[in-house]
């Protein structure tokens, strides 16, 4: 992703196993469509749980700061490769495929702790970070209004927390500059968040507006915490919709599925489709439908749908 200053920032998993790294590259002098590999400036790196849920959403906000989506690490959704079940022949190259359950609803209990990372404000997992990449070289500076800046309760970089895998971020470049984060469900509920304030957006206490407990994912409780560990109110998405997991025979959630995985979107500001102007337009991985919602908080309804053309 290129900023107005022709920089490229891209998070990726480094060559060392389970390291999360975000680097800045300059544009190649020979090809404006390529990055100069030799120009790498490592902005941030830290140990990682697994090869999944890396996040990856990046966007420069109207304030000029870089917003970074960091996933929870996927330590539960797809058991970490470091796990070898008891009584397993460690010389068997197929041991993982044979003995580790692939179903995210059937994960060994010792790995449930990874669900808590997104709520832990001492960790960067499951967060939206906000950093100033134009200062603080060779790393970055912390914006003065970040919620935990200079406080012991959390990491300075954190802007918002409680996300499973915020892999798509976008700002409305007109209007109020609204900030949208799209999330993919762990169990049933796909979400879109309007980040209109710093705070706690729920995972893994909630999935969307619904209570979440991994040990009873098919039969989630009706009541759960409404506030986080710091006393903060848990904030809700502006939209959620059920995915195909609600159709599984074990599910007690009664809803009509509308897709498989929310892939994110943008506020439309073009001229070709006037009826969509100012609406947040987004897609789903499998439904073949593009949806649009009226921007604004706290609208939860889908304002309209369009079949794929």
List each language-model region with its residue ranges.
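Metzincin-family zinc-dependent endopeptidase catalytic domain
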Residues: 2, 24, 52-64
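A well-ordered secondary-structure block
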Residues: 42-45
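Short glycine-/Asp-/Thr-/Trp-enriched loop segments that recur within the blades
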Residues: 47-55, 159-161
């Amino acid at each position: 992703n290129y900023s107005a200053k022709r920089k490229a920032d891209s998070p990726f998993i480094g060559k060392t196993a389970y390291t999360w790294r975000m680097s800045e590259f300059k544009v190649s002098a020979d090809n404006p469509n390529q990055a100069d590999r030799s120009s790498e400036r490592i902005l941030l790196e830290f140990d990682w749980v697994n090869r999944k849920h890396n996040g990856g959403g990046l966007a420069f906000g109207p304030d000029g700061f870089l917003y970074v989506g960091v996933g929870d690490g996927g330590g539960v959704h797809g058991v970490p490769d470091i796990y070898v079940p008891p009584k397993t022949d460690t010389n068997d190259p197929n041991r993982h495929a044979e003995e580790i359950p692939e179903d995210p609803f059937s994960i060994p209990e010792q790995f449930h702790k990874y669900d808590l990372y997104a709520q832990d404000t001492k960790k960067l997992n499951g967060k939206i970070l906000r950093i100033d990449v134009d200062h603080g070289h060779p790393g970055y500076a912390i914006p003065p209004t970040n919620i935990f800046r200079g406080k012991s309760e959390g990491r300075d970089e954190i802007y918002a927390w409680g996300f499973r895998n915020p892999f798509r971020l976008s700002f409305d470049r007109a209007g109020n500059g609204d900030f949208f984060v799209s999330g993919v469900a762990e169990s049933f509920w796909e979400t879109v968040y309007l980040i209109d304030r710093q705070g706690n957006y729920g995972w893994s206490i909630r999935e969307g507006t619904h209570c979440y407990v991994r040990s009873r994912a098919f039969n989630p409780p009706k009541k759960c915490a409404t506030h986080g560990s710091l006393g903060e109110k848990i904030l809700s998405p502006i939209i959620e919709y059920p995915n195909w997991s609600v159709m599984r025979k074990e599910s007690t959630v009664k809803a009509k599925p509308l897709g498989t995985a929310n892939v994110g979107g943008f506020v439309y500001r073009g001229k070709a489709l006037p009826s969509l102007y100012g609406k947040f337009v987004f897609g789903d991985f499998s439904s073949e439908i593009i949806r649009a919602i009226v921007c604004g908080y706290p609208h939860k309804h889908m304002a309209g749908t369009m079949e794929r053309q």
